[in-house]
């Protein structure tokens, strides 16, 4: 089973909105095979908290215009990693440091990438571990460097 077409269409709106606010390395990942609660992750990088906030505002505005409201929001106090849960898809807007540290790209590197017309293709991490096939916890990839505060 793969992501529902409506989820793909709606997550594409989010990806394009993030691109409008200069979000980088935008990944639209079909996580439906490994997640029972959602079909798609949209993962976006931003340079700083201000840009995270701008991207989140644009994504919410575009999706609201399309008739969608998030079921849940997390992280919109510090704007380092904001999660917008729309049920069938989840938008993660992260500072580059948080994206590297928490490693969603590494955890879901085996999931299919959904191409979005007009957006630069997502670049997968060069090295990744097939995390669903490891037999020992020591074989799991470690997190990146601890993120620093924006000054």
Could you describe each region identified by the protein language model?
Residues 51-68, 83:
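Compact, glycine-rich, soluble single-domain proteins
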Residues 8-39, 47:
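N-terminal first-folded block
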Residues 25-37, 71-88:
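Glycine/charge-rich, flexible interdomain linkers and switch-proximal surface loops
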Residues 43-45, 94:
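Short hydrophobic/aromatic beta-strand micro-patches
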Residues 86-121:
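A contiguous, mid-protein "functional segment" used to position or interact
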Residues 1-7:
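N-terminal presequence-like segments and adjacent domain-start helices
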Residues 122-151:
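Intrinsically disordered, low-complexity charged/polar segments
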Residues 19, 23, 27, 60, ...:
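Signal for well-folded cores of large energy- and translation-related assemblies
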């Amino acid at each position: 089973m793969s992501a529902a077409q409506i989820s793909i269409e709606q997550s594409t709106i989010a990806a394009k909105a993030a691109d409008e606010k200069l979000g980088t390395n935008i990944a639209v990942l079909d996580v439906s095979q490994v997640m029972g609660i959602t079909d798609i992750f949209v993962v976006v990088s931003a340079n700083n908290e201000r840009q995270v906030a701008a991207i989140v505002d644009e994504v919410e505005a575009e999706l609201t215009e399309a008739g969608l409201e998030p079921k849940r929001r997390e992280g919109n106090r510090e704007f380092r990693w904001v999660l917008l849960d729309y049920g069938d898809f989840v938008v993660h807007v992260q500072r580059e440091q948080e994206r590297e540290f928490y490693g969603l790209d590494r955890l879901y590197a085996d999931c299919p990438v959904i191409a979005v017309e007009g957006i630069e293709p997502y670049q997968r991490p060069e090295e990744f571990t097939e995390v669903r096939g490891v037999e020992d916890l020591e074989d799991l990839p470690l997190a990146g460097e601890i993120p620093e505060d924006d000054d």
